[in-house]
């Protein structure tokens, strides 16, 4: 037993040692670059899935192991750790820093919730819509962390409103009972002595009634101190928490910058297929936005039915008088919005830069019309989405956060202190350096698989899968990704599977986007467990949910997500990217055998 305790305490260390030693026969017995690269891939994948080492530290292992096995030089590996992705990430984080610093995100969220009203069903839809919108531009984690305190305040107001309503009803009950006793005493005074004698026990029962009323009051007071007044209140709290967790993830699907998995895929894809010009911010938004909207609405219906039931009559009843709960919710949201005051100069500037950046992203090369990138036609492919992000990011360090001059008491105008919208220290606190290193490690790993020939070998071995229908291959890969992402981090999942799925598509002569796009979207479908992704963990920490609640709700959302992705792939996405044809930008795989 003591040995088991030691093993449990040192489990991470033992896992690292055992993984390295157990897999070591692979490169020792099969002496080839493919086997050596496969060994490195298995070791890194094991560490990423189990988190025996921090994810970003594991991502540095290619820089150590590839030179040791003679697959790539240190200089070559190091160059893979900083790509166009990192420039795009820096620009986006500058925007996110300014949005959160000046509370623009809170203003947007509260305004959207106020627009939809406080009916429980519409309130949850309002929270989901605002959270999803913010998650398109901010990280899923920061979005969930920002919205949850507002949701918690609304949940507390719902509970207190219920207590107030019940207290009002109890007061009315006691007053009615007292009036009834006075009437009884008048009638008793007019009756005979014999009747009075018979009514003495009845008078005693009136005291009992008073005791019962007192006892009921005590019980109500006891319940008032409890966390929830009723099961419905508890279900409402669960519903709102899960709505925030899931909508922050769903909203991230919509843009390339919405979540790290989209960014990782985009950079991997552009690196492997540099001649493909079909994937950019605008085209990604056009195909993913319908997926996100449909999934958001279906998730809302599913969660509403699961926790509160779905009463169409109550939802769409016109002229309905607001309940005490709904009035309390509206008051909380209104108070939170009023605390922000009028829109400030800093918020306006941030919003303008945000809108301009989004418009430039959309119009750079939309595909159906000529974009502004033709202005740089002499250098095709040089200007990317990261160029726009950097221009916007630099503006946040240049534009002053307040007036540059002020008037003294004597009427003189003097120069005032200059401070930009954001500072480098503030940017650093928001910059996810661990994700930047993790993505760099994924690029290095993909380069190693390409240089060693492992990618080509995997592709040749997977070519027999070409006999299966394309829809079945997509479904199988989507289900595998959805299952794996529940136990491994989303960035690690896409980083591990991209070097496998790309050769698979090439080997069976299918447009790589046909398999990679649904797999990338499904990588974000980590809805089952609190540890599956940070938004789940954030909402779980508020104490309203049990694991089984998240499993039941998440299983339904997972199924809906895969179904919506499959629907999209064979309806609007297929003609958008011409997926039924094998593209010229994808290489033809020549079958290779492993020595």
Swiss-Prot record:
The chain crosses the membrane at residues 13-33, 40-60, 77-97, 113-133, 134-154, 239-259, 283-303, 348-368, 381-401, 464-484, 491-511, 512-532, 553-573. Glycans are attached at residues 174, 591. Belongs to the SLC13A/DASS transporter (TC 2.A.47) family. NADC subfamily. One of its GO terms (cellular component) is plasma membrane. The keyword DNA-binding does not apply. The keyword Ribonucleoprotein does not apply. PANTHER family: SOLUTE CARRIER FAMILY 13 MEMBER, SOLUTE CARRIER FAMILY 13 MEMBER 1. One of its GO terms (biological process) is sodium ion transport. It is a multi-pass membrane protein. Optimum pH is 6.5-8. It is found in: Apical cell membrane. Sodium:sulfate symporter that mediates sulfate reabsorption in the kidney and small intestine. Can also mediate the transport of selenate and thiosulfate. Pfam families: Na_sulph_symp. This is Solute carrier family 13 member 1. It catalyses: sulfate(out) + 3 Na(+)(out) = sulfate(in) + 3 Na(+)(in); selenate(out) + 3 Na(+)(out) = selenate(in) + 3 Na(+)(in); thiosulfate(out) + 3 Na(+)(out) = thiosulfate(in) + 3 Na(+)(in). Coiled coil: none annotated. Keywords: Cell membrane, Glycoprotein, Ion transport, Membrane, Sodium, Sodium transport, Sulfate transport, Symport, Transmembrane, Transmembrane helix, Transport. It comes from the Eukaryota. Residues 208-218 have a biased composition (Basic and acidic residues). Residues 190-218 are annotated as: Disordered. GO terms for molecular function: monoatomic anion:sodium symporter activity; secondary active sulfate transmembrane transporter activity; sodium:sulfate symporter activity. The gene is Slc13a1.
